[in-house]
Amino acid sequence: MEVSHVTLAPNKDSRAAVLTIGKFDGVHIGHQTILNTALSIKKENEILTAISFSPHPLWALKQIEIYREMLTPRMEKERWLAYYGVNHLIETEFTSRYAETTPEEFVTDHLTNLNLSHIVVGSEFNFGKGRDSDVDLLRDLCKPYDIGVTSVPVIETNQTKISSTNIRAFIRRGHFQEAEELLGHPWYITGIVENGEMTGLDDYVLPATGTYQTDSGIVNVTNNRTIEVGLSDGLQQLHMKNELSE
């Protein structure tokens, strides 16, 4: 998968493409449904492009702490998006300047740089300054450019909305099985282990301080955003299973 990093409009790309747009934190079942819909629309000569945003707008603009933490920091998100069929990821840095982009500018100055036949987004998608513009406006703004727009309904399972927010809440409570049911794939923590401590986890949502069973043995999540592990030094990955009772 090709990855481009931009701060405002994407670079011009003449390749025919179908586009998806979103934060894609976790690349959960809802995201996968959007991606699969885009893949079903995409013609053989087209690529699947995704525009994603980092950091979360509510962290970038208002420093709301819970939105700093992610299910899948950048490298993990890229890995899952590639796995689910994205050919070109445009990773957009969300800043106060970017937040001033109007809906009209987003379409005329950003999307028209891409050779798009169709855009697929979630039904709750909003965009542009104030985030008060919806799929209907996106569809209207894209009509003059002959770009189709499809919205994918929100998915629920067991009366729980599949969303990154709900999955992060499950992780914080140590409910990993419930989180993975909404993710549709395993959830891993990847970090650097040195002298029995996994660090570099500042961007991850982590479960509460405690002792947990993982696929690599028992670990302790500390209150300073490190995990005590019995693993050799270097880059390691943990698959959390469940919290152990005291």
Swiss-Prot record:
**Cytoplasm is among the record's keywords:** no
A single GO BP term for this record reads: FAD biosynthetic process
InterPro entries in alphabetical order: FAD_synthase, Riboflavin_kinase, Rossmann-like_a/b/a_fold
Keyword ATP-binding among record annotations? yes
Q: In which pathway does it act?
A: Cofactor biosynthesis; FAD biosynthesis; FAD from FMN: step 1/1
Per its UniProt entry, what is the enzyme's top EC class, as one word? transferase
Q: Which Pfam families match?
A: FAD_syn
Q: What does this protein do?
A: Catalyzes the adenylation of flavin mononucleotide (FMN) to form flavin adenine dinucleotide (FAD) coenzyme. Can also catalyze, with lower efficiency, the adenylation of the toxic riboflavin analogs 8-demethyl-8-aminoriboflavin mononucleotide (AFMN) and roseoflavin mononucleotide (RoFMN) to 8-demethyl-8-aminoriboflavin adenine dinucleotide (AFAD) and roseoflavin adenine dinucleotide (RoFAD), respectively.
Q: What is this protein called?
A: FAD synthetase
* Originating species: Listeria monocytogenes serovar 1/2a (strain ATCC BAA-679 / EGD-e)
